[in-house]
Regions:
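Short alpha-helical elements of helix-turn-helix
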Residues: 13, 19-25
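Short basic coil micro-motifs at the edges of alpha-helical modules that engage polyanionic partners
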Residues: 16-17, 75
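Conserved strand-loop elements at the edges of beta-sheets that form or border functional pockets
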Residues: 21, 67-69
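Short, Lys/Arg-rich nucleic-acid/phosphate-binding segment
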Residues: 69-75
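C-terminal regulatory/oligomerization modules of transcriptional regulators
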Residues: 1-15, 30-44, 49, 58-62, ...
Length: 113
């Protein structure tokens, strides 16, 4: 897993940047719940449709959302590939923490050494 983290850091960095903005997180959570158009998303958010489009572009560039044509509009949905990149990155650190915990638990107490 170390190799993965070293080979693809730009993917993870762009995901953290994309999710670092509260409006983008809200948009991402909404499209993760169900596919939506820009108009649907903008209807409930305190930002304009052009701003929603810009946020979606950042999320799409990070690999977190994808879009498809539906008539004269685009429908956005969660892209699982971006989440897989983030999960692999976080799993790397989780596995390190678990290994360190296992080592600590398996060591005899100091008075028994």
């Amino acid at each position: 897993m170390t190799t993965y983290v070293r080979e693809r850091p730009e993917n993870v960095a762009s995901i953290f940047v994309a999710l670092g903005d509260p409006t983008r997180r809200e948009i991402f959570e909404r499209v993760a719940a169900r596919p939506q158009s820009v108009s649907e998303l903008a209807g409930d958010l305190p930002v304009s449709r052009p701003a929603v489009s810009q946020h979606l572009r950042v999320l799409k560039d990070a690999g977190l959302v994808s879009d498809r044509a539906a008539g004269n509009r685009r429908i956005y949905s969660m892209d699982r590939c971006g989440l897989q990149d983030l999960r692999a990155y976080l799993d790397f650190f989780w596995n390190q923490a678990l290994a360190a915990f296992k080592t600590a638990v398996e060591q005899p107490p100091k008075e028994q050494r």
